[in-house]
Amino acid sequence: MIALGIEGTAHTLGIGIVTEKKVLANVFDTLTTEKGGIHPKEAAEHHARLLKPLLRKALQTAGITMEDVDVIAFSQGPGLGPALRVVATAARALAIKYNKPIVGVNHCIAHVEITKMFGVKDPVGLYVSGGNTQVLALEGGRYRVFGETLDIGIGNAIDTFARELGIGFPGGPKIEKLALKGERYIELPSAVKGMDLSFSGLLTEAVRKYRTGRYRVEDLAYSFQETAFSALVEVTERAVAHTGKNEVVLVGGVAANNRLREMLKIMAEDRGVEFFVPPYDLCRDNGAMIAYTGLRMYLGGVRFKISDTVVKQKFRTDEVDVTWS
């Protein structure tokens, strides 16, 4: 079977086409601004403007037509309301026009589910992006959140710190590069709050120290990264210990960071569990993960009426009954 998926929860519009074992197309376009940040209205306008050309490109890349598609999936949430509504409207229109079944997909779950295309069975997932930071795993028929940010996502924290340092947006690659030149660790407050995480205190103190002018930016970048990532690894390790699972996956845009990958790999080796990171185009927000998850849901018996496709801006990961996995 072939599924087409449309992703549009935030600033990236993605369209993916997959089978159960292969990505046939995975195209996207990201709204970028000089100062960073996303205005929901601008994201919606971006998605509406690019939907047709991206759909055309995806179909051409896959070498198929809409008639060949068996199921249409879309990101139902969580995300920015105006952006989600553009995507949902497009998915409904395609489903009705071509008489195809439609499936609404939880964006966070899709980030973990796509790893199963590569043979991952039942992992603990660390999902790290601009707006989201979660440690999740399948337990009792739902993806349970074992730890999450209580304030801002790790990606937003990194980007905000980068803006304070005056090194621009996106900040992730630039902070990572600066951190490689760090020579000493500067003490910063832990981001661990029980099983959850809070990056606001860490960010505030790092910015305060920078503004004193007494510290090298390379050392601050190194210290910020080490402190934040240590917290992520600690909470992930606790989830592994609690669940007894033997696989850890790293997904989301911040999965591009090599230091975070290294730290998680060390933890996984110490605990004797497998560690996996998908190709980066399947880590970031993308349509292929929506298509793949929608296909798995459909094959597992999940069915949606058009009336079930209302978007959910605050769609919780643990709301979904996972009957297909």
From Swiss-Prot:
Q: One Pfam family for this entry, by name?
A: TsaD
Where in or outside the cell? Answer: Cytoplasm
Any one GO CC term of this protein is:
cytoplasm
Q: Which GO molecular-function terms appear in the entry?
A: iron ion binding; N(6)-L-threonylcarbamoyladenine synthase activity
The keyword Transferase appears for this protein: yes
- What's the EC number here? 2.3.1.234
**Which transformation does this protein catalyse, written as a reaction?**
L-threonylcarbamoyladenylate + adenosine(37) in tRNA = N(6)-L-threonylcarbamoyladenosine(37) in tRNA + AMP + H(+)
For activity, the cofactor(s) needed are: Fe(2+)
* Chain positions recorded as Fe cation binding sites: H107, H111, Y127, D285
SUPFAM superfamilies referenced in this protein's UniProt entry, alphabetically = Actin-like ATPase domain (SSF53067)
Q: Which positions make up the signal peptide?
A: none
- Highest taxon above the source species: Archaea
Keywords annotated in UniProt: Acyltransferase, Cytoplasm, Iron, Metal-binding, Transferase, tRNA processing
Q: Which HAMAP family match?
A: Kae1
Read off the PANTHER family from this record.
TRNA N6-ADENOSINE THREONYLCARBAMOYLTRANSFERASE (PTHR11735:SF14)
Q: Which family does it belong to?
A: Belongs to the KAE1 / TsaD family.
Instruction: Describe the task this protein carries out.
Output: Required for the formation of a threonylcarbamoyl group on adenosine at position 37 (t(6)A37) in tRNAs that read codons beginning with adenine. Is a component of the KEOPS complex that is probably involved in the transfer of the threonylcarbamoyl moiety of threonylcarbamoyl-AMP (TC-AMP) to the N6 group of A37. Kae1 likely plays a direct catalytic role in this reaction, but requires other protein(s) of the complex to fulfill this activity.
Q: What is this protein called?
A: tRNA N6-adenosine threonylcarbamoyltransferase
- What organism is the protein native to? Thermococcus gammatolerans (strain DSM 15229 / JCM 11827 / EJ3)
Gene it is expressed from: kae1
